[in-house]
UniProtKB/Swiss-Prot annotation:
Job description of the protein: One of the primary rRNA binding proteins, it binds directly to 16S rRNA where it helps nucleate assembly of the platform of the 30S subunit central domain. The combined cluster of proteins S8, S12 and S17 appears to hold together the shoulder and platform of the 30S subunit.
Subunit structure: Part of the 30S ribosomal subunit. Contacts proteins S2, S5 and S12.
Any one GO molecular function term: structural constituent of ribosome
Family of this protein: Belongs to the universal ribosomal protein uS8 family.
GO cellular component terms listed in the entry, alphabetical order: ribonucleoprotein complex; ribosome
GO BP field: translation
Entry keywords, A to Z: Ribonucleoprotein, Ribosomal protein, RNA-binding, rRNA-binding
PROSITE patterns in the cross-refs: RIBOSOMAL_S8
Keyword Ribosomal protein: yes
Protein's recorded name: Small ribosomal subunit protein uS8
Length: 138
């Protein structure tokens, strides 16, 4: 039994990028789809689509990589360098608008679940709302 499906999704994405997979499948939910929508809009993934695998709904996440590097390691640059769950089932983390962290001085994003929906840190600051700090990505 999974106790934290969001952490499972982030781990699947992290593991797939480390071995340069083109895509990975995660069990579908509306909340996960909202997180993936933000990751796609911010340029961390190519996109995603709903698929059925053995009659069960999944989200197929298409991962994104940068150009191939020069030198002895010709693998492409990873777009997602770090993806980490912050608020967990055992320790929820809520922040007000003034406590929303700036991830890597604005180069990364924090994803929050707010009363206005699932938002990035910049959107939440702009709207003046706080919420549950789901994860950070850079």
């Amino acid at each position: 039994m999974l106790t934290d499906p969001i952490a499972d999704m982030l781990t699947r994405i992290r593991n797939a990028t480390r071995v340069y997979k083109e895509s990975t499948d995660v069990p579908a939910s509306r909340f996960k789809e909202e997180i993936l929508r933000i990751l796609a809009r911010e340029g961390f993934i190519k996109g995603y689509e709903r698929v059925d695998v053995d009659g069960k709904p999944y989200l197929r996440v298409y991962l994104k990589y940068g150009p191939r590097r020069q030198g002895p390691d010709p693998r492409p640059e990873q777009v997602i360098h770090h993806i980490r769950r912050i608020s967990k089932p055992g320790r929820r983390v809520y922040v007000g608008v003034k406590e929303i962290p700036r991830v890597r001085r604005g180069l990364g994003i924090a994803i929050l679940s707010t009363s206005k929906g699932v938002l990035t840190d910049r959107e939440a600051r702009k709207l003046g709302v706080g919420g549950e700090l789901i994860c950070e990505v850079w």
